[in-house]
Amino acid sequence: MGAELPTRPVDIKRIGLDAVDEVTELFLGYLEFYKRPSGPEAARAFLMERLKRDESIILAARMEGEPALLGFAQVYRSFSSVSMAPVWILNDLFVSPHARRLGVGRALVRMVVDLARSAGAARVILSTDESNTSAQTLYESEGFTTGHPVRHYVRRTDG
């Protein structure tokens, strides 16, 4: 598998409340990918609430000079007591199926890492479905690793 090479530069912007409608369609695609379909009103409300409460950063990508959004990333900020520093969680990354392998996902990941570094974050963490091997390949090619001395556990509380 070769590296993604954008045909044109990817333009990435932070999304504010005024642009949530633009990213909602991509967010719906993301939810569908993870088999968690939602209606547009609920998806939009979720994104609006995260931004109103300053709980997340949403980045949106398009090819330079093109109006259509092709991908987005949503980051949540947390902290590491041991590192005594912020930690960024790259929680959501989605690229429209027709725009995959054009460098959009890679550009979004790199932007998240650059912004986290600028904000003094100790690290960026993320997770992906075990079956999503193309995402795993991207993350590993960008320096993300899975072998850590810390084991992560998950316990669902929603049922």
Regions found by a protein language model. Give the residues of each.
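A short beta-loop-alpha structural element at the N-terminal edge
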Residues: 10-25
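Conserved GNAT-fold acetyl-CoA-binding loop/helix
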Residues: 24-49
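A short helix-loop-beta-strand connector motif used in the catalytic cores of GNAT acetyltransferases and
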Residues: 48-60, 89
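Conserved beta-strand in the GNAT
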Residues: 60, 68-77, 89, 94
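Glycine-rich phosphate-binding loop
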Residues: 83, 99
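Conserved acetyl-CoA-binding loop-helix of GNAT-fold acetyltransferases
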Residues: 95, 101-114, 137, 141
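Conserved active-site alpha-helix within GNAT-family acetyltransferase domains
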Residues: 106, 130-149, 155
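Conserved GNAT acetyl-CoA-binding A-motif
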Residues: 116-128
